[in-house]
């Protein structure tokens, strides 16, 4: 099933798991991946809770799942680019993350979160949503084999749900990405990466 050139991640909140589409259509839902809508999969992967309507998917067994933004469970699935046969990669693959460092509060990342504070204790809600959106990926990014191929772009100045950023903000974010990529590639060593993280057993 890994022959597809586009793979998106979604959070199936009905079954409580991260799903990679189209890879998991058959395994999780018993559906033929070639018969499923690409547009629906992409829309599900961006269905941020409280802001966009979830996507519903009915399995071959008749069970309907609710699909939301895959970032709820994994916002940086760079391992989707890896080979699955255990062999060393033939070329490098890089990930670019726009996740900010964990802020003191959620307002920097989700400026409209104040509307939802009334649902419970503000500090607890802040901590829970911050950890859900950022914390898990921060821990993942700190793994040496992930960090070694990750270009980190500081996006703290742009909120997670800023849909109407100005031209100046776009230019500033572009410049940060450009500078981060240049700095990363200046020190990138493909052979060293293979030795450290992708060495294989010559007899295997």
Give each language-model segment a name:
Residues 1-204:
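Patatin-like phospholipase
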